[in-house]
Each structure stands twice: as structure tokens, then as C-alpha cells.
Amino acid sequence: DCPSDWSPYGGHCYKLFKQRMNWADAENLCAQQRKESHLVSFHSSEEVDFLVLLTFPILGPDLYWTGLSNIWNGCSFEWSDGTKVNYNAWASESECVASKTTDNQWWSFPCTRLQYFVCEFQA
């Protein structure tokens, strides 16, 4: 079960944070919510559709941090929760990855950029 202020989907719980933070601070705030919580990771197009429905009505056309970065391994990207990248929607490449609320295209930015973010944990 998800806490009342989190949204359930596919055995996971999601929460949109309508405050802008850099990637590391956003990931830390996710972990402060629950120790198993991380910035969101995507593993199917259905999950992506759910995230568009969660984020777009609140943020409008904007971007939010995902857990995808190359901070831990400069050569390849991985989700902050340690899961493998088995679904992707690249628009470009860099260090930390934000997702677009309108079509879920991925955009890479310096990790210091301030963005909204979504946290996720397994229910």
C-alpha cells in the first residue's frame, strides 16, 4: 500500500515534488521520504504513460528529474535505484536526465540544474 499522498501504479508508489532542486538534492530528499525511495525510474511505456498523467496536469509542459544519470559510472547511465536501463527514450545525452511532462522525451542536463522531480519506491 502507498501512503495517502503517494500515487500507486504497478506495485510502486510515486510522488511528484513541486519544488525545484538539483539532482543530488532531489535524490537525497527521495531517500528521506523512505529509505527505499529514489528518483523515478522507467521500465515500460505503460509506466511512462502513468507518469505523464501524474505530472502534466500539475506541472504543465515542463521537465522533471528522473533517477537516470552517469554519476556512478561515467561511461554508462544507470537508474539511481540500481536497476538496469531496459527502456529508453533519449532526446540527447549528458550527465543527469530529466523527462518531459508532455511526451516523456528524455533530456540531459548538468546535474546542478534545478528541476521538479518524482520519487518512487516499491510498495
UniProtKB/Swiss-Prot annotation:
Disulfide linkage: C2-C13, C30-C119, C96-C111
Main location, first listed in the record: secreted
GO cellular component term, pick one: extracellular region
Residue span, C-type lectin domain: 9-120
Gene3D superfamilies: Mannose-Binding Protein A, subunit A
Location within or outside the cell: Secreted
Keywords on record: Disulfide bond, Hemostasis impairing toxin, Platelet aggregation inhibiting toxin, Secreted, Toxin
GO molecular function: toxin activity
SMART domains per record: CLECT
Quaternary structure and interacting proteins, as annotated: Heterodimer of subunits alpha and beta; disulfide-linked.
Family: Belongs to the snaclec family.
Protein name: Snaclec GPIB-binding protein subunit beta
Organism of derivation: Bothrops jararaca
Source taxonomy: Eukaryota, Metazoa, Chordata, Craniata, Vertebrata
